[in-house]
Each structure stands twice: as structure tokens, then as C-alpha cells.
């Protein structure tokens, strides 16, 4: 099989992780930046461009031809129009962002865009613990909580691409308000940010 190379980006509320990988899942280069998610969408896009240019420079030095970029982002993503619609409460101003268009203009490389948890779940199905399985449920816990469901080897998106937002499944009836506008969501009680929010007052009282 002829090797093909791509840049993969995992955008989160805490960090931006990026890598140069091939079509067999082998990593050639990895990097990480502290996310500017609390600043603005423009600041975050600038970080993505910086990360991509760093990976591009490495690839050029080694003589690897990059075929494209894959970006995983929190929130609700319109994959057809390649737009972040919203729903990423941990990134300031991250809504109605034509992210793939921005990245292609800035870098000259074609870009694919998807929900971060969905893409991680698909990657785990193809290369990780889910290899050989036709049905997979994937859960990621970090600044927020995301999830993916793979049925017959294909991602299940549900209505308006919101079907696997597992972090916003109501966990506690009449629970505390979540940043998404609902109440009692899993993410509000079990993400790393919520853990700090819920436990810090108790720690300070000790």
C-alpha cells in the first residue's frame, strides 16, 4: 500500500493536540499547545494554523506529501457544509464557524471537519480497541464529555448531528443547570471542569 500522509488535530478546551500520521495509523510527528479557548474563536483558529504549519514544516523536511487535514472539534458540526454550529461551551465564541474554509484558505491544504468524539470513536474502531467490532459505543472524558456510536461500522449521527452528545444526556432529574441550557447533564457532574467546580468549595472548607 502506498503511504499517504495527513495532519490530524484534536481541538479541546484545554489543549490543541496535533500530529502527522499515515494511512496505517503510524505517527511521525506530534505537538501540543495550551488552548486559547477562553479568549476568542479567532485566537483558536490562529493556533490551529500555527499547529498545521509546524507539522507541514516537518513533512517538507522529511519529503512527505500531505494529502489533507482532519480536524476534530467539540460541539455540533455540520459535516456537509463543514461548519461548527455551536454547542462547544468550553470554547468562547465557537459557533457558526466555517472552520474548514478558514483552514484551507490559510494553509492551502484540503480539510475535513467533524465532532471530536465522533472522530475519536471512529479512529478507535478502525485502529484501536474497537478493531473487528461492528457496533461500538465510545465515551471521552476531558474538559467536557463527548461520545460516539458506531453501528455496522458507520458513525451514527442522529437528528441534526446531535444524536450522540452523550455528555448532555440528563443524568439527574431536576439537577443543576448545564451550560447547554438543560439541567442535570452528565457533563455537568462528571467532566474535569465540573469535578473542580463541584469539589473545590469542599476542599476550601477543610
What are these regions (language model features)?
Residues 3-44, 83-86, 161:
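Short glycine-rich, Thr/Ser-proximal phosphate-binding strand/loop in the N-terminal lobe
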Residues 6-10, 66-70, 136-140, 179:
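Short glycine-aspartate micro-motif
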Residues 22, 79, 150:
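Short, acidic, Ser/Thr-enriched surface-loop or helix-capping motifs
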Residues 37, 41-49, 64-69, 76-135:
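Glycine-rich phosphate-binding loop and adjoining helix at the ATP-binding site
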Residues 47-60:
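Conserved active-site "lid/cap" helical segment
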Residues 71, 195:
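Residue-level signal for inorganic ion chemistry
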Residues 131-189:
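Glycine-rich phosphate-binding loop of actin/hexokinase-like ATP-binding domains
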Residues 196-202:
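Conserved small/polar residues in nucleotide/adenosyl-binding loops
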Amino acid at each position: 500500500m502506498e503511504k499517504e500522509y495527513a495532519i490530524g488535530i484534536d481541538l479541546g478546551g484545554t489543549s490543541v493536540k496535533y500530529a502527522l500520521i499515515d494511512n496505517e495509523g503510524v505517527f511521525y510527528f506530534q505537538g501540543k499547545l495550551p488552548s486559547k479557548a477562553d479568549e476568542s474563536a479567532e485566537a483558536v483558529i490562529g493556533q490551529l494554523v500555527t499547529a498545521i504549519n509546524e507539522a507541514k514544516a516537518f513533512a517538507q523536511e522529511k519529503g512527505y506529501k500531505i494529502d489533507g487535514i482532519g480536524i476534530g472539534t467539540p460541539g455540533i458540526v455540520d459535516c456537509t457544509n463543514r461548519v461548527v454550529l455551536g454547542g462547544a461551551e468550553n470554547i468562547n465564541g465557537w459557533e457558526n464557524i466555517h472552520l474548514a474554509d478558514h483552514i484551507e484558505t490559510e494553509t492551502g491544504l484540503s480539510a475535513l471537519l467533524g465532532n471530536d468524539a465522533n472522530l475519536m470513536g471512529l479512529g478507535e474502531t478502525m485502529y484501536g480497541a474497537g478493531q473487528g467490532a461492528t457496533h461500538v459505543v465510545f465515551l471521552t472524558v476531558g474538559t467536557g464529555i463527548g461520545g460516539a456510536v458506531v453501528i455496522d461500522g458507520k458513525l451514527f449521527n442522529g437528528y441534526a448531528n446531535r444524536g450522540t452528545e452523550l455528555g448532555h444526556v440528563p443524568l439527574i432529574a431536576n439537577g443543576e443547570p448545564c451550560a447547554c441550557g438543560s439541567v442535570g447533564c452528565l457533563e455537568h457532574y462528571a467532566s474535569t471542569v465540573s469535578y473542580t467546580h463541584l469539589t473545590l468549595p469542599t476542599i476550601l472548607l477543610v
